[in-house]
Amino acid sequence: MDQQYSNELTPEIVAELEMSPFTAEEIAAMDQDSRAIIAEEKALEWKHPVNAIWRIATEGNITRCGGIVAPVERESKLLLDNGRYASIATAGDIVTCPEGSTATIATSAGATSMCNGADVALVDSLLDNGDEIISTPQRHTYLVTREGITSGADFLTVTGA
């Protein structure tokens, strides 16, 4: 079985998120307008620190009750640590439960994150049987929420409810 990752916001992830993608030399070489944009973004990040991460779900995710998100062939895939690619899971995808029944992913990132018109599922997405996705085999791709900034109205909300 592939390594699994949760939505735990670790000190390592916080440090990674706080790291600038630009070196001091790159910033110094930028024009004043570009440096101003970077400074504004940094101020926003300090005012509204990350308070949660939401990993993107893929085939192979595990649910609280031991279900596994079934493989679906999609163009949109994420690279796993083992070098394999896994299709991104979306609302409506099937989860195979340990006793042989199936359930459907019922909640997603909503309009915050879509994949070819379908709502992307997340770790913490609920299933139509009350189960919940708790981990994913991919560690690199996630959404963040920030203190004081609300998520979209359809974020992790059952659609049609």
Which residue stretches match the model-derived regions?
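Intrinsically disordered, low-complexity proline/glycine-rich segments
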Residues: M1-A161
